[in-house]
């Protein structure tokens, strides 16, 4: 997970954020709104609302490891 975190921190453009989001979803990482519970918090991505993956979020989101 350290590698993913470093890659995320290194990416700053919206395009990379959306691509990273798609990759993380494939790896079983879920996106939750900032106001929700944050179990197993990995890292906090920059605010970015480009692309369909972020269309429903108006603020920064947290990524958590899916256990379902």
Swiss-Prot record:
It is found in: Secreted. Keywords: Acetylcholine receptor inhibiting toxin, Disulfide bond, Neurotoxin, Postsynaptic neurotoxin, Secreted, Signal, Toxin. Expressed by the venom duct. One of its GO terms (cellular component) is host cell postsynaptic membrane. It comes from the Eukaryota. The cysteine framework is XXIV (C-CC-C). The 3 disulfide isomers are poorly structured in aqueous solution. The toxin (with connectivity C1-C2, C3-C4) does not have inhibitory effect on alpha-2-beta-4/CHRNA2-CHRNB4, alpha-3-beta-2/CHRNA3-CHRNB2, alpha-3-beta-4/CHRNA3-CHRNB4, alpha-4-beta-2/CHRNA4-CHRNB2, alpha-4-beta-4/CHRNA4-CHRNB4 and alpha-7/CHRNA7. The toxin (with connectivity C1-C4, C2-C3) does not have inhibitory effect on alpha-9-alpha-10/CHRNA9-CHRNA10. This is Alpha-conotoxin VxXXIVA. The lineage of its organism: Eukaryota, Metazoa, Spiralia, Lophotrochozoa, Mollusca.
């Amino acid at each position: 997970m350290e590698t993913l975190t470093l890659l995320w921190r290194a990416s700053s453009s919206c395009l990379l954020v959306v691509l990273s989001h798609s990759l993380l979803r494939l790896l079983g990482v879920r996106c939750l709104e900032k106001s929700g519970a944050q179990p197993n918090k990995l890292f906090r991505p920059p605010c970015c609302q480009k692309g369909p993956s972020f269309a429903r979020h108006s603020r920064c989101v947290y990524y958590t490891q899916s256990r379902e």
